Amino acid sequence: MKTALVIMAAGIGSRFGGGIKQLAAVGPNGEIIMDYSIHDAIEAGFDKIVFIIRHDIEEAFKEAIGDRIEKICAGLGVEIDYAFQALENVPEGFSVPEGRSKPWGTGQAVLACKGIIKEPFAVINADDYYGKEAFVRLHDFLQGYTPDKPGDLAMAGFVLKNTLSDNGAVTRGICQMNDAHYLTGVLETSGIEKTA
């Protein structure tokens, strides 16, 4: 069964002086975090990659990663597609409040994929590293998807202290679960720092 990896890469990048933070080199040969995530996902069995970006960063994004990844993936039989997050893309019956200038975030980003994704999929942030094991577990879960159980969902959660940076405060989604281990909410929390 085909499985897709959706990579949210539309971040404004204000922490990087207005640049595209997802394109910052971290590896010894200029690799970016997405290179590692895409490699791990393909190794785990994902065969479609969908980048969620903004129209205004499309050219820079494709120059920095998209075109290169498309060439690599073409030789591996992995499909590449793009979805575009835009402020005005809201569900039918809704409108953008007057004065709002920024897109809505994760939910709206995933909504941008409507019509592009037909297969089971996983969603990741472009600038977070998840590790091979997370992609293997997600792919294995998605392989068990059946259309008669469309509500089957999974989340690769991480212990908060293991996701903190040595280089200052971070923002994380703190997941809340009920007694049956179902996700009941996500609280976006800013300014989280390691303590001694």
Enumerate the language-model features and the residues they cover.
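Glycine-rich N-terminal loop/short-helix segment of MobA-like nucleotidyltransferase
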Residues: 1-28, 44
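Conserved N-terminal catalytic core of the sugar/cofactor nucleotidyltransferase
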Residues: 2-7, 31-123, 130-131, 135, ...
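Short beta-strand/turn micro-motifs composed of small residues
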Residues: 9, 27, 53, 125, ...
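Active-site metal-binding loops of divalent metal-dependent hydrolases
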Residues: 12, 127-128, 160
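Short glycine-enriched, charge-decorated loop/helix-capping segments at active-site entrances
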Residues: 20-26, 96-100, 170
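Conserved beta-strand segments of alpha/beta enzyme cores
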Residues: 22, 79-81, 182
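Residues that form or immediately flank small-molecule/cofactor binding pockets and catalytic motifs
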Residues: 28, 85-88, 188-191
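Conserved core of the sugar-phosphate nucleotidyltransferase
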Residues: 132-196
